[in-house]
């Protein structure tokens, strides 16, 4: 189960039950507080006084996205900071948004941000940078992609009937050509060939080449960047982080606490998200060193087996090549974007927070990232994005909160309330905050507070949690409540005993050309069952009043161990491990589970045993 253990709460011999006093400080209609009341037992007055005091600290108060979306004027910036203070906020993320008239990253922009930092500091509030013009992080408003080598790239698959060789035109940036025999949409056999004349009669010519992302107005006439390319990432850091450092680097780690990275991704896998061109569903991520790195890590040549990446082979829904491909992409993203970014920030005193692109379903994680939990490992305060109201993706904050517990991270962020609309009441804001707090969210980033609602800005993810809303003078009650709640949780350890092996790696191997619809919907029955089991298992556990964390197999391989009857990931130990719905499991995970069970740990396999180990089919 889940128990909240209060650190240092019994420093004296005073054993009076102060639970009701605590509940009078924080309203009782919150599930987390009832959990606290019935699990903690006795709480001393010293602890309660500390909670009241801590609840007033900016550290525990929300920091909204301050949508800087017009012509910035210092008097108006100062006025709005005062409004934030009155609304109970503890600072703000300084965020360029649609409608910005001041030149992004220009001298005036930098002066205005420095002014905001100083004004926030005068009021005892925190400043947090945001690393992009709108989103996603990496382009500096598109300018990084002016250099063509930095642009997002994809492998493209083209299928044609040209067995006589006359209709084939070798594309620019050619990779490989195959003669392929299909049975419907499944591979029967394939052979790499050197020319179209070698295509066997009755078979298809399947050609692979790579292409740059097409320019887009969203990126100011350029593209997203190749986040798998370390040189592109260096250019991004130089264009943004280094510029901020030169302007006000002496404030890093002091007045300026950290920086928000938003919707980082490595490009879409078979779903065309953000691409939008006619071939987008035929595309998977590519970078210059892809084939070299793949062979180094997986010990075989991806070029020789590209058809198995795209198509189901020999009656199997699961592809070892697709499984390996997503794994290599994940490793390259971490090595070339995540780790260098975090290293730069650590060396310069900035906390890294934010969230990646699409965390909801397994398909979302697979198509745009691979493993969100592996990415969270390298964020100081891992975070999520929860759009809309009553968006009960309970397992998403649990993914970030699990990593935070396992690797000792102080806060877990949620970018919340975005596009929730103008009908939201204060009770609605509290309700959506409550369930996320119960799932481990301790750093609130309300989305969005408009600088102005002129022009296009008024259509940017309403409502505005700012003075444009009539209730803004009453909103402080919401934030006072949550700041005290977060102060409570900062003094607590959530003693979760149960671990669920996260099934995302099974989704990697079920990915294929034609396997996704409407971006994140899946077409194959086995993939649908995997998604359903993922949702149903966590929901069932929660409804039974039991808590559980998730364990990512990559993180288990890196930081897992069995010790004294507990299975540890990093610094968090578990008494019980649940394996449910997996199509594949790592051999390293199995070995650790065997060791854990031998020490007296409990391992529960729910439903069928995985059919694959390390992506290879089990034959006995």
Task: Pin down the residues of each PLM region.
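Short, low-complexity, charge-dense intrinsically disordered segments
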Residues: 7, 13-34
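Short, small-residue-biased leader/transition segments that mark boundaries at the very start
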Residues: 1-6
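Extended, non-globular alpha-helical segments
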Residues: 81-84
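Short linear interaction motifs
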Residues: 237-243, 479
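Carbohydrate-binding surfaces of carbohydrate-active enzymes
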Residues: 41, 50-51, 56-63, 73-79, ...
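Acidic/aromatic-lined carbohydrate-recognition and catalytic surfaces
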Residues: 96-196, 202-234, 238
């Amino acid at each position: 189960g889940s128990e909240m253990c209060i650190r240092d709460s019994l420093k004296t011999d005073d054993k009076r039950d102060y639970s009701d006093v605590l509940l009078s400080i924080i309203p009782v209609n919150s599930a987390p507080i009832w959990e606290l009341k019935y699990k903690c037992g006795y709480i001393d007055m010293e602890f309660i006084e500390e909670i009241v005091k801590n609840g007033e600290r900016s550290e525990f108060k929300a920091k909204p996205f301050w949508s800087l979306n017009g012509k910035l004027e210092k008097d108006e910036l100062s006025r709005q900071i005062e409004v934030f203070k009155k609304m109970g906020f503890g600072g703000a993320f300084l965020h360029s948004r649609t409608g910005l008239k001041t030149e992004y990253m220009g001298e005036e922009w930098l002066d205005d941000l420095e002014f905001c930092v100083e004004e926030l500091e005068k009021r005892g509030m925190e400043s947090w940078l945001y690393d992009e013009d709108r989103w996603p992080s990496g382009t500096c408003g598109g300018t990084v992609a002016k250099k063509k080598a930095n642009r997002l790239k994809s492998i493209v698959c083209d299928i044609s009937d040209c067995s006589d060789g006359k209709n084939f035109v070798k594309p620019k940036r050619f990779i490989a050509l195959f003669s392929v025999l299909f049975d419907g949409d499944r591979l029967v056999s394939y052979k790499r060939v050197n020319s179209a004349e070698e295509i066997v009669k009755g078979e298809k010519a399947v050609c692979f080449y790579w292409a740059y992302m097409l320019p887009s107005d969203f990126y100011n006439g350029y593209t997203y960047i190749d986040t798998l390319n370390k040189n592109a990432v260096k250019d991004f850091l130089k264009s943004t982080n280094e510029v901020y450092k030169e302007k006000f680097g002496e404030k890093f780690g002091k007045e300026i606490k950290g920086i928000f990275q938003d919707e980082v991704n490595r490009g879409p896998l078979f779903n065309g998200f953000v691409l939008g061109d006619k071939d987008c569903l035929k595309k998977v991520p590519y970078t210059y060193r892809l084939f070299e790195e793949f062979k180094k890590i997986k010990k075989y040549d991806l070029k020789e087996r590209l058809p198995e990446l795209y198509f189901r082979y020999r009656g199997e829904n699961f592809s070892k090549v697709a499984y390996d491909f997503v794994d290599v992409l994940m490793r390259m993203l971490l090595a070339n974007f995540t780790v260098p970014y975090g290293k730069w920030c650590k060396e310069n005193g900035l906390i890294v927070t934010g969230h990646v692109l699409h965390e909801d379903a397994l398909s979302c994680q697979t198509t745009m990232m691979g493993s969100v939990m592996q990415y969270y490992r390298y964020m100081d305060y891992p975070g999520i994005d929860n759009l809309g109201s009553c968006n009960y993706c309970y397992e998403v904050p649990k993914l970030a909160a699990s990593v935070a517990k396992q690797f000792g991270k102080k806060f877990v962020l949620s970018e919340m309330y975005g596009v929730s609309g103008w009908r939201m009441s204060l009770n609605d804001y509290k309700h959506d905050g409550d369930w996320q707090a119960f799932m481990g969210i301790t750093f609130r980033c309300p989305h969005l507070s408009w600088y102005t609602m002129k022009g296009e800005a008024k259509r940017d993810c309403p409502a505005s949690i700012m003075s444009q809303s009539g209730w803004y003078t009453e909103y402080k009650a919401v934030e006072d409540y949550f700041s005290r709640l977060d102060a409570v949780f900062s003094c607590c350890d959530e003693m979760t005993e149960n671990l669920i092996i996260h099934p995302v790696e099974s989704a990697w191997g079920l990915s294929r050309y034609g396997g996704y619809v409407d971006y994140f919907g899946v077409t194959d029955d086995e993939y649908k069952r995997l998604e359903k089991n993922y949702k149903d298992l966590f929901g069932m556990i929660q409804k039974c009043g039991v808590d559980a964390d998730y364990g990512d197999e990559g993180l288990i391989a890196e930081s897992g161990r069995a010790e004294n009857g507990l299975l540890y990931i990093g610094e968090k130990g578990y008494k019980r491990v649940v394996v449910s719905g997996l199509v594949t499991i790592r051999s390293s995970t199995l070995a650790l589970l065997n060791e854990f069970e031998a020490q007296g740990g409990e391992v529960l396999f729910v439903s069928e045993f995985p059919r694959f180990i390390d992506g290879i089919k089990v034959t006995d």
